[in-house]
A protein has these predicted regions:
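Flexible "cap/lid" subdomain of the alpha/beta-hydrolase fold that forms the substrate-access gate
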Residues: 2-12, 19-21, 31, 59, ...
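Conserved residues at beta->alpha junctions
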Residues: 36-39, 196, 275
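Catalytic histidine-centered segment of alpha/beta-hydrolase-like enzymes
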Residues: 268-276, 281
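Alpha-helical elements of the RecA-like P-loop NTPase motor core of helicases
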Residues: 42-46, 203, 282
């Protein structure tokens, strides 16, 4: 299940785009940035980051509002979050990077590639479809499975209810969205619970979803203007997950990007980097080597 370890990554913090970001970095070679989703932190890349650092410079931030990074009261739209990570990597001396995003991190990667195409050489998205396309297909069947998108949009109430039992709320998703349960070991779940038990962490996580009106405005403007992703794009998803069983993933990405490849990963649901890290590594190494 766990890939062979590579170089250890070093934790650090930096102020980027006005917020303090925690990140880990290590290795040498072409730079690649790994972006996590909800309800997680950069810890979700623990099985992938080290081995990938054997031949890449790997940068793993906690996105604004998550993990050990600042918990601001605004700026959870994907344009701002992408600008944060852009400032981080430029501060580290990298003008052009490959990006890999899981879940919400994939949405940040998509926005980064559109807003700053000169910085993103290629990117991979794990277990997400384009945001605009997903909302367009939010019928009763998909809404019943992705109800949290609608619930997390509500002001204040998600924090009040989830805050009464942070561990119970997170475990619901971490367990229900997982096929290969051994990939999310108890220590990892405990780390995510700890991270979201910090002051402001639940609010920021829900604000990530509540930024949808702003994100939708940006997405619609790009689509209407015919602005597409021109970089090579790799899409991977869990064959047992909601996305893979509900939506035509590659077809949807081809509506938004010119150069798309990818596949479903068997015996895997949503948490792809943890459930099937060796397959993710194989796919990423092949994809990144094409640069």
């Amino acid at each position: 299940m766990t890939a062979a370890p590579g170089p250890a990554l070093t934790p650090d913090t930096v102020v980027a785009n006005g917020v303090r970001l925690h990140y880990r970095h290590g290795g040498s070679g072409p730079p690649v940035v790994l972006l996590h989703g909800w309800p997680q932190t950069g810890h979700c890349w623990r099985h992938v980051a080290g081995p990938l650092a054997a031949d890449h410079t790997v940068i793993v931030p906690d996105l604004r509002g998550y993990g050990a990074s600042d918990k601001p009261t605004g700026g959870m739209d994907k344009r701002t979050m992408a600008a944060d990570v852009s400032a981080l990597v430029r501060g580290l001396g990298h003008d052009r990077v490959a990006v890999v995003g899981h879940d919400r991190g994939g949405r940040v990667a998509h926005r980064w590639a559109l807003d700053r195409p000169e910085e993103v050489t290629r990117f991979a998205v794990l277990d997400i479809a384009p945001t605009r396309a997903t909302w367009q297909r939010m019928d009763a069947a998909l809404g019943a499975k992705y109800w949290h998108w609608l619930f997390h949009l509500q002001p204040d109430l998600p924090e009040r209810l989830a805050g009464a039992d942070v561990e119970g709320y997170l475990r619901y998703f971490l367990e229900k969205w997982t096929y290969a349960r051994e990939g999310l070991e108890p220590a990892a779940i405990a780390e995510y619970v700890r991270a979201f038990s910090q002051p402001g962490a639940l609010r920021c996580g829900f604000d990530d979803y509540r930024a949808h009106p702003v994100d939708a405005e940006h997405d619609e403007a790009d689509f209407s203007a015919g602005r597409r992703v021109t970089q090579p794009l790799l899409a991977l998803w869990g064959a047992e997950g909601v996305m893979g069983q509900t939506l035509p993933m590659l077809d949807l990405w081809r509506e938004y990007a010119d150069d798309v490849r990818g596949r479903a990963i068997e015996r895997c649901a949503h948490f792809v980097p943890e459930e099937r890290p060796e397959e993710v590594l194989d796919e990423l190494r092949t994809f990144l080597a094409e640069a």
